[in-house]
């Protein structure tokens, strides 16, 4: 069992039951999945960009991402239907908890000028989104071997009904909120 998974069962669940007064353990919010998404609009010009991005996401997530393709043609962006324009990977279970552990304890502190993550990036249904500007904050990425700095979006889906419950859940995982 992953370190954060044990931490959730032993510390987070009792703390949230005490804070929100849940009657059952099954009412306590939990993280269901984490999705990493990398949009690669510049991949239209060069196919190697997709390969490098897939390699980076594979190292970061520990599993192979799926290449997302354009749903429809957009002439202004020089994109045809079916062109590869991104990569995404969905993490669940043990891999999800291990990624969350690495993200909170190792990757976030490596962000330049880091003052904490925004407490307002919740969607109203208990899900949280973080944008990362550079993939080099992850220790799995070798700085000398990257071709370009690419950002990615990290979406954390929870079973929380409200944003307050989700924020309390993530804060109990030692998420460094700034407000």
UniProtKB/Swiss-Prot annotation:
InterPro entries: Ribosomal_uL5, Ribosomal_uL5_bac-type, Ribosomal_uL5_C, Ribosomal_uL5_CS, Ribosomal_uL5_dom_sf, Ribosomal_uL5_N. GO terms for biological process: translation. Pfam families: Ribosomal_L5 (PF00281), Ribosomal_L5_C (PF00673). One of its GO terms (cellular component) is ribonucleoprotein complex. SUPFAM superfamilies: RL5-like. One of its GO terms (molecular function) is rRNA binding. Transmembrane segments: none annotated. Keywords: Ribonucleoprotein, Ribosomal protein, RNA-binding, rRNA-binding, tRNA-binding. This is one of the proteins that bind and probably mediate the attachment of the 5S RNA into the large ribosomal subunit, where it forms part of the central protuberance. In the 70S ribosome it contacts protein S13 of the 30S subunit (bridge B1b), connecting the 2 subunits; this bridge is implicated in subunit movement. Contacts the P site tRNA; the 5S rRNA and some of its associated proteins might help stabilize positioning of ribosome-bound tRNAs. Part of the 50S ribosomal subunit; part of the 5S rRNA/L5/L18/L25 subcomplex. Contacts the 5S rRNA and the P site tRNA. Forms a bridge to the 30S subunit in the 70S ribosome. Belongs to the universal ribosomal protein uL5 family. This is Large ribosomal subunit protein uL5. It comes from Burkholderia mallei (strain ATCC 23344). The gene is rplE.
């Amino acid at each position: 069992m992953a370190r954060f998974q044990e931490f959730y069962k032993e510390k987070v669940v009792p703390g949230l039951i005490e804070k929100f007064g849940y009657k059952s353990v099954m009412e306590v919010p939990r993280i269901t999945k984490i999705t990493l998404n990398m949009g690669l609009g510049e991949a239209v010009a060069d196919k190697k960009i997709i390969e490098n991005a897939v390699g980076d996401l594979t190292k970061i997530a520990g599993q192979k991402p799926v290449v997302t393709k354009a749903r429809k043609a957009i002439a202004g962006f020089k994109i045809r239907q079916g062109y590869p324009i991104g990569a995404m990977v969905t993490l669940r279970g043990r891999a999800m908890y291990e990624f969350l552990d690495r993200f909170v304890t190792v990757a976030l502190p490596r962000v330049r000028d880091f003052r904490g993550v925004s407490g307002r990036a919740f969607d109203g249904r208990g899900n949280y989104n973080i944008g990362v500007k550079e993939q080099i904050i992850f220790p799995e990425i070798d700085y000398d071997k990257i071709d370009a700095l690419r950002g990615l979006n990290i979406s954390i889906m929870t079973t929380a009904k409200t944003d307050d419950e989700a924020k309390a859940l993530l804060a109990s995982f030692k998420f460094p909120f700034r407000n």
